[in-house]
Amino acid sequence: MIPVIRSFLSLLLCVGLTFGLGGCVTTSLPMAAASPWNSQKLGIESNPLDVAFTNESHGFLVGSNRLVMETSDGGETWEEREIDLPADENFRLISIDFNGDEGWIAGQPGLLLHSDDAGQSWSRLLLDTKLPGDPYLITALGSKKAELATNVGAIYQSSDAGKSWQAEVVDAAGSVRDLRRGDDGRYVSVSSLGNFFSTWDPGQSNWQVHQRVSSQRLQSMGYQPDGQMWMVTRGAQLRFNPEGGDYEEWSKPVIPITNGYGYLDMAWDPQGNIWAGGGNGTLLVSSDGGKEWEKDPVGTATPSNFTRFVFLGGNKAFALGERGAILRWVG
């Protein structure tokens, strides 16, 4: 009798968990018939972290272990580039951006590079030793103008090619694990432990702190194409922000698949499809706003953790993996 009771209780627990998570939980998904991605292997051990282009054909990829690669054919092929940096420092080049021929690279520890000739040469900018944190995200805003955010949420702007910087916030947000900038200049950051997130709108003097919406720790957050927000939490859960101005209002969790691997990033492609990437070749796509999902065949066949999507406008996009693995958007 006792085994029967235990089985019944286990069934009730499973049903309760399924409904408590607010959606259908599955351990398998159908495979998409085709993929808009092309797999590339760069032949390196470093992790690619960001991509930016000066025009339709010419661009750069940066990453860990001082990685700099250049393309002149829209990203079909890449060649390693050497930048004059101290040999005894193993820089992590984490962010790159261009405005025409003017480019910026942010790296750790304490590195900021500037170019005014489409990346043919780079000069190192001196950063104040009192700068809170390390450079994390650089955004080119116009001629000689850029915005720099650090890994503790300090935000600065320069309008003289990086010679001087003006603080945008009075106090930093604290150590972050993820930080994103919206097209309208808003920022969202996830705390290093994932137990809360912070938002900053242009004109505010301080970051606004918000508690996480469930017991699941936050992994990453960002902005949807319409300016509303998305959230990835531990436990392979996705959430959406239905009211862009209300940072406390979130959808029930969406759990596309429970395969033991979490998600690391989300993005929207030019057709409005949602992509979610994560561990061990996890690359999923939804064409109906997150209700139904499919596995991408190219991503599934790529033995890598997909850490970030970079959609650059038009039909140019990349899914960045680890140890030189990237996917290029071919539509």
Curated annotation (Swiss-Prot):
The keyword Magnesium does not apply. A lipid is attached at C24 (N-palmitoyl cysteine). InterPro entries: PSII_CF48-like_dom, WD40/YVTN_repeat-like_dom_sf, Ycf48/Hcf136. GO terms for cellular component: photosystem II; plasma membrane-derived thylakoid membrane; thylakoid lumen. Residues 1-23 form the signal peptide. A lipid is attached at C24 (S-diacylglycerol cysteine). It holds the Pfam family PSII_BNR. It is a lipid-anchor. Its main location: membrane. It is found in: Cellular thylakoid membrane. GO terms for biological process: photosynthesis. Keywords: Lipoprotein, Membrane, Palmitate, Photosynthesis, Photosystem II, Signal, Thylakoid. The keyword Ligase does not apply. Part of early PSII assembly complexes which includes D1 (psbA) and PsbI; not found in mature PSII. Binds to the lumenal side of PSII complexes. Interacts with YidC. Belongs to the Ycf48 family. NCBIfam families: PRK13684.1 (NF010237). A factor required for optimal assembly of photosystem II (PSII), acting in the early stages of PSII assembly. Also plays a role in replacement of photodamaged D1 (psbA). Assists YidC in synthesis of chlorophyll-binding proteins. HAMAP family: Ycf48 (MF_01348). A 7-bladed beta-propeller torus, about 55 by 55 Angstroms, with a depth of about 25 Angstroms and a central pore. This is Photosystem II assembly lipoprotein Ycf48.
